[in-house]
Each structure stands twice: as C-alpha cells, then as structure tokens.
From Swiss-Prot:
UniProt entry tagged with the keyword Nucleotide-binding: yes
Name of this protein: Phosphoribosylformylglycinamidine cyclo-ligase
Record InterPro entries: PurM-like_C_dom, PurM-like_C_sf, PurM-like_N, PurM-like_N_sf, PurM_cligase
Enzyme Commission number(s) of this protein: 6.3.3.1
Gene name of this polypeptide: purM
Length: 345
C-alpha cells in the first residue's frame, strides 16, 4: 500500500500548485520577497512607516460552502473568504498587506481547488494585498470526497496615531450604511433550512425579476477595502467603522462605538432587498431573528461627523456602491445599557 492508495495524491497536489502559481504571484506587492515553495512567506513592511501596528484577522465562509459545493460555485467562495477577513481588518483604518489561506478536503479536485484559489487571488488583487502562501490538506476519511473547508488569515498595517478605534465618535455623528451584495457569508445555516423547507433548487426563481434564487444567494461578499482606502486618501475623517456579519447590525454596529454612546438607526432609511423578505416569508423567520442573523442590505457602516456625510456619499458613489445615512450616535442612558436603538419592536 502507498500514500495514493490511502487517499492522498501527492502528484495531484504538485500539479495543483503549478496550476495556481501565476494567479498567486500576480497578487504580489513590491514588498514580497521570493515566490511559492518556501516554508514561510516573506514580506517587508511598506517604507515610510514610523510607528506601525500590525492588525490580524481570521475567518471562514461557514456553511455557505455546502451550498456552493452543491452548485459548483467555487470561485465565489474564494472571494467570500477574502471579504470576510479583509472587511474586518480595515475597520481599524489598516492597509491589508498579505493573506494566507487554508484548504482542507477529502480528496483533492485540482479544478475545483484551482477555482477557489483563483477567487482568493482575485479578492486579494482587489484588496491590494498579496496572497503570500497557503496550505492545502488532503484528509481522506475525515472529509467526504468533494467536500472542503476554508479558512483565511489577513495581516494589515496602520500607523499607531492614525488607527481608527472609535475613540473619536461623539454624539451627533452620523452612521452611513454601505450596501451589501446580498446575504454575504453568514446566516447560511438558517438559509439552508429555508431552502430545504421550500424544496428550492437551481431552477427556482424569486422576486419581481424572476431571479435565480441559488445564484442570488451565492453572490460573493462585497469587498470594502478600496472604498476605505479611497476615503482615507481623500482625507475624509472616519471616526468608526463596522463590518456587518453574524449578528447583523444589532451585534456589530455597537462594537465600533464607546460604551457611553448608543447607535440609533432608522430602518426606513434604506430599502430592504427582496431576498431577505423572501427568506423571512418562506421560513417564517421572526423579525427579531432576521435582524440578529442577516445584514439586511447593509454590509458595512461608517461613523463620521455630520459635515462630511456628503463627501462620504460621493466617494461611495464613485465606487459604484450604494450608501445611505441610516442613523446617528447619541448619549447612552446608563439605566438601560442599550447599545443600539431603532429596531422594529
């Protein structure tokens, strides 16, 4: 018996590395030293930094992977993986430097895995960070054939005196909501239950435009890194930022705000995408659970002074991203301890 008989194809792994090499190396920034094949990726810090802080984040794509694997949507989950990590680290005003991926699978499918990595590489390219390395683990008997899991790791850098940590947020500041592309990459355990309940498949259409339901659900996560970079380069003072993922607005927006303040949102200030209404109706999801599970059309939030709202909206428009003033910051009531107000009762 040999390793291949046991379920691990080393030759297929080598062929896979050669297949993805050009996509990976196309993401490399000038600071990257060397190419694929080393025990660790090497990268210099960008020149001109005085007191750099490194910002690190890690995440996955959750059970969206199961739906993607069922429908061979491998490229999109690569973009999702980058979005889940990069959108977190940029909330501190940091510039993404490099990304690492981990792929675990039951049996290596070079074509499917190449599509995943090409999606990761494209996400890195759009975010300005290098895909510095990764690991692909073939684990027969642990994962079913055709099944894989993903994890991503992003490291970014910010000058210590330019770090955005919410300390500048004050009463009267405005909250700008930036549109999501859909469900993004959280809440899919609930999504999959709704799909099973309705017996939806790849031919199921929904909404007034008769959109393909599965394709819409698998739309990749919006990458907000270029937007934040453009705002910072335009010297727009950002007081706080929040990536709206698991827990929705109620559990993510308050994370960027000091505890003596409360965020107050107006749900009527943006139109909830019809996909979320379909999920609620089809799954009979209570309104409270909907708000605490999904982004409901707002994937990222910016907290700014009232006088720069128009500047922020202009930069969002230049990025072809819809954005709306969705609320404001107020002084919190010590007696209630609430961090967010305005949700439907």
């Amino acid at each position: 018996m040999d390793y291949k008989t046991a379920g691990v194809d080393v030759q297929a792994g080598r062929a896979f590395i050669e297949r993805i090499r050009s996509s990976v190396e196309a993401t490399h920034r000038p600071e990257v030293i060397g190419g694929l094949g080393g025990f660790g990726g090497l990268m210099r810090l960008p020149a001109g930094l005085n007191k750099p802080l490194l910002v690190a984040g890690t995440d996955g794509v959750g059970t969206k992977l199961e739906l993607a694997q069922q429908h061979q949507a491998h490229y999109g989950v690569g973009l999702d993986l980058v979005g889940m990590c990069v959108n977190d680290v940029i909330t501190s005003g940091a510039e993404p430097l490099f990304f690492l991926d981990y792929i675990a699978t039951g049996a290596l499918s070079p074509e499917a895995m190449a599509q995943v990595v090409e999606g990761i590489a494209e996400g890195c390219r759009r975010s300005g960070c290098a895909l510095l390395g990764g690991e692909t683990a073939e684990m027969p008997g642990f994962y079913d054939p055709g099944c894989y899991d993903l994890a991503g790791f992003c490291v970014a850098v910010v000058e210590e005196d330019e770090m955005i940590d919410g300390r500048k947020i004050k009463p009267g500041d405005q909250i700008i909501g930036v549109a999501s592309s859909g469900v993004h990459s959280n809440g899919f355990s609930l999504v999959r239950k709704v799909l099973a309940l309705t017996e939806a498949n790849k031919n199921t259409l929904f909404g007034c435009d008769n959109k393909p339901l599965i394709e819409t659900l698998l739309t990749p996560t919006t990458l907000y890194g270029q937007l934040v970079k453009n705002l910072l380069e335009a010297k727009v003072p950002l007081h706080g930022m929040a990536h709206i993922t698991g827990g929705g607005l109620p559990e993510n927006l308050p994370r960027c705000c000091p505890k003596d303040l409360v965020t107050v949102i107006d749900p009527s200030s943006w139109t909830r995408p019809e996909l979320f209404q379909w999920l609620q109706d089809a799954g009979q999801i209570p309104e409270h659970d909907l708000w605490h599970t999904f982004n409901l059309g707002v994937g990222f939030c910016l907290v700014v002074a009232e006088e720069v709202v128009s500047d922020v909206l202009q930069v969002c428009n230049e990025q072809a991203l819809q954005a709306w003033p969705i609320g404001q910051v107020e002084t919190a009531s010590p007696s209630t301890g609430e961090r967010l107000r305005g949700l439907p009762s």
